[in-house]
UniProtKB/Swiss-Prot annotation:
<dbReference type="InterPro" id="IPR009068">
    <property type="entry name" value="uS15_NS1_RNA-bd_sf"/>
</dbReference>
<comment type="subunit">
    <text>Part of the 30S ribosomal subunit.</text>
</comment>
<dbReference type="GO" id="GO:0005840">
    <property type="term" value="C:ribosome"/>
</dbReference>
<dbReference type="GO" id="GO:1990904">
    <property type="term" value="C:ribonucleoprotein complex"/>
</dbReference>
<dbReference type="GO" id="GO:0003735">
    <property type="term" value="F:structural constituent of ribosome"/>
</dbReference>
<keyword id="KW-0934">Plastid</keyword>
<comment type="similarity">
    <text>Belongs to the universal ribosomal protein uS15 family.</text>
</comment>
<dbReference type="GO" id="GO:0006412">
    <property type="term" value="P:translation"/>
</dbReference>
<dbReference type="InterPro" id="IPR005290">
    <property type="entry name" value="Ribosomal_uS15_bac-type"/>
</dbReference>
<dbReference type="GO" id="GO:0009507">
    <property type="term" value="C:chloroplast"/>
</dbReference>
<dbReference type="InterPro" id="IPR000589">
    <property type="entry name" value="Ribosomal_uS15"/>
</dbReference>
<dbReference type="Pfam" id="PF00312">
    <property type="entry name" value="Ribosomal_S15"/>
</dbReference>
<keyword id="KW-0687">Ribonucleoprotein</keyword>
<keyword id="KW-0689">Ribosomal protein</keyword>
<keyword id="KW-0150">Chloroplast</keyword>
<protein>
    <recommendedName>
        <fullName>Small ribosomal subunit protein uS15c</fullName>
    </recommendedName>
</protein>
Length: 92
């Protein structure tokens, strides 16, 4: 059971392939869900520094996965960015 209805829509597409839970897309969706929950938590608890550190770590993991996906398959990267409504990473 998924608590977040937004993520459940994307997870339904991913659940067609049960073996695909380790895919980059599934991991990015999971990290995005955690990021949104932590962000709403930190709006209430501004001085929760351990949660801030956890949020920064998850953001870094998601950023690395998105960089990997953009190098390997640009089309899937663009689709995922569009579905999750995430900004595209800056290029140097």
């Amino acid at each position: 059971m998924v608590k977040n209805s937004f993520i459940s829509i994307i997870l339904k597409e991913q659940e067609e392939n049960k073996e695909n839970r380790g895919s980059v897309e599934f991991q990015v969706v999971s990290f995005t869900n955690k990021i949104r929950r932590l962000t709403s938590h930190l709006e209430l608890h501004k001085k929760d520094y351990l949660s801030q550190r956890g949020l920064r770590k998850i953001l870094g993991k998601r950023q690395r996965l998105l960089a990997y996906l953009s190098k390997k398959n640009r089309v899937r990267y663009k689709e995922l960015i569009g579905q999750l409504d995430i900004r595209e990473r800056k290029t140097r």
